[in-house]
Amino acid sequence: MIELRGKAVADAHKAILQEKVAAVGDSVITMAVLLVGEDHGAHMYATFMEKTAKNFGYGFVLKQLPETATQDEVVAALKELNDDAAVHGILPLMPMPKHIDTEALIDMLDPKKDIDGLTTYNIGLVTAGKGGFAPCTAKACMAILKHYDIPVEGKHVVVIGRSQVIGKPVALMTLAAHGTVTMCHSRTPDLAEQVKRGDIV
């Protein structure tokens, strides 16, 4: 069994990203984060994203709304980011307050700015194997396999979890790479047995 560590892969990708940002020159690439409410994890992630932007030299915009923000107010904030030509990528942070219809909100996101592959449009492209933006964690899983020179073709891949941002896209991407995929989740019986059968877990 080979345990796959992500740090070496992350370090290599950081160097590549720094080169790409530097190559843009005077043009500023800007990422926007839409943060609604008081979720501690979402606030911590927004802080992390801002620090990352500073470290790499790209622009960062934080659009923050209170817990009491209405659906219309959140939609208006997203539309403003969609329409802003200076913003190149948008990441709506989850979870949002329970009264916000996040599914409806996400599909109002400009697919060209949907950097975490959340929209139905990008999910469809990934599902069809026609590109599109895939969620970053799913892309990271594929990058780790590539870094360690582990072929997916012909392998039995066991994916644990079925979330929209990790499990499902990882399953689709490994399937597109000609793996044989088994998806497991909280209601899968004999999970340990499924894991034993996998070439890649």
For each predicted feature, which ranges?
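Short beta-strand segments
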Residues: 35, 91-95, 160
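Short beta-strand elements in bilobed, periplasmic/extracellular small-molecule ligand-binding domains
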Residues: 53-68, 181-183
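N-terminal glycine-rich anion-binding loops that anchor highly charged ligand groups
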Residues: 22-31, 37-55
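Short, well-structured alpha-helical segments in soluble
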Residues: 73-85
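Helix-enriched interaction subdomains in cytosolic or periplasmic regions
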Residues: 1-9, 84, 100-107
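Glycine-rich phosphate/diphosphate-binding loop of Rossmann-like nucleotide-binding domains
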Residues: 36-50, 135-201
